């Protein structure tokens, strides 16, 4: 992941790939 996306959108310690609308529900499986 790109650093600027990583620090901008980090929810519960899980990076949301810079897409706040997805939050961590989609990426929680990763």
From Swiss-Prot:
List the keywords (alphabetical).
Answer: Hemolymph clotting, Lipid-binding, Secreted
Q: Which GO terms describe its biological process?
A: hemolymph coagulation
One Gene Ontology cellular component term attached to this UniProt record is: extracellular region
Looking at the keywords, is Secreted present?
Answer: yes
Main subcellular location: secreted
Tissue note: Secreted into the hemolymph.
Q: Where is the signal peptide?
A: none
Q: Does the keyword Secreted apply?
A: yes
Gene Ontology MF annotations: lipid binding
Which compartments is it annotated to reside in? Answer: Secreted, Extracellular space
- Tell me, in a sentence or two, what this protein's role is: Clotting protein.
Tell me the subunit arrangement.
Homodimer.
Q: What is this protein called?
A: Fibrinogen
């Amino acid at each position: 992941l790109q650093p600027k996306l990583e620090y901008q959108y980090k929810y519960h310690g899980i990076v949301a790939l810079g897409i706040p609308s997805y939050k961590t529900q989609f990426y929680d499986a990763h």
